[in-house]
């Protein structure tokens, strides 16, 4: 327990849409100093985009993977229905999250939805391994958020919409 306390106490607070003061690699390197090799290995396996539950996954990661898998399935069904001009009612997230705005705004909205899911899971984890798992996932969300290049994305979006007209 002490090792988690000292590691977590020195981590900077993360805020959505604010560039983090620590990178994921810096976080994992610092965690290596405090965690056992087996525990550190579990932490390095955390992957925001992974939805397959593996044996040995901590309970919090299994829950997140189920959440992510259900979110993606519902989005795929919704997008498929839209292509066929059919109605589809989203049940896991507000429709406005994916309907309003350009593709970049929608992607940011979905990242924020994931962030909120992690925020809701966090109160039960103050100075434990679960907090570190959540922190790692949040760093991955921020990394993805700050890799978006708005001018390049807008150019590609306009190319795709022009060719489909």
Predicted region positions:
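Extended alpha-helical surfaces
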Residues: 1-165
């Amino acid at each position: 327990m002490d090792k988690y306390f000292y590691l977590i106490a020195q981590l900077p607070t993360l805020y959505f849409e604010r560039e983090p003061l620590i990178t994921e690699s810096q976080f994992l390197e610092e965690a290596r100093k405090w965690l056992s090799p087996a525990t550190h290995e579990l932490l390095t396996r955390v992957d925001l985009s992974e939805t397959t539950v593996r044996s040995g996954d901590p309970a919090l990661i299994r829950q997140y993977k189920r959440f992510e898998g259900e979110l993606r399935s519902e989005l795929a069904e919704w997008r498929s229905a839209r292509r066929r001009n059919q109605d589809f009612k989203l049940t896991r997230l507000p429709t406005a999250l994916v309907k309003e705005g350009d593709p970049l705004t929608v992607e940011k909205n979905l990242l924020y939805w994931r962030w909120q899911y992690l925020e809701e899971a966090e109160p039960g984890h103050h100075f434990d391994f679960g907090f570190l798992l959540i922190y790692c996932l949040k760093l991955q969300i921020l990394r993805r958020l700050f890799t978006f290049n708005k001018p390049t994305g807008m150019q590609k979006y306009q190319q795709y919409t022009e060719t489909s007209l």
